[in-house]
Amino acid sequence: MAKWILLIVALLVLSHVPPGSTEFKRCWNGQGACRTFCTRQETFMHLCPDASLCCLSYSFKPSRPSRVGDV
C-alpha cells in the first residue's frame, strides 16, 4: 500500500509543469520581444519596462529618419 501512495505522489509531483518562457513580453507595437539577449537575426531597439532588451527582427527595423541637410 505504501508503494502505491509513493507512486501516486511521485506522479503528481512529476506531472506539475512549471511555467516556461514561451510567451515573451511584446514590444515595439507587437513586432518585438522583450528578452535578456537578442538572437543573431535580431537587433536591440530600446529597453522594455522590466529593463530587458526589446529585440526586433532585422526585417522589421525601421529606417532612420532623413535629415534636411542630407538631401
Swiss-Prot record:
Residue ranges crossing the lipid bilayer per the database entry: none
GO BP term (any one): defense response to bacterium
Disulphide bridges, residue numbers: C27-C54, C34-C48, C38-C55
Gene Ontology, cellular component aspect: extracellular region
Superkingdom, taxonomy of origin: Eukaryota
Principal location listed in the UniProt entry: secreted
Subcellular location: Secreted
Pfam families: Defensin_beta_2
Signal peptide extent: 1-22
InterPro entries: Beta_defensin_dom
Keywords tagged on the record: Antibiotic, Antimicrobial, Defensin, Disulfide bond, Secreted, Signal
Role played: Has antibacterial activity.
Protein family membership: Belongs to the beta-defensin family.
Protein name listed in UniProt: Beta-defensin 25
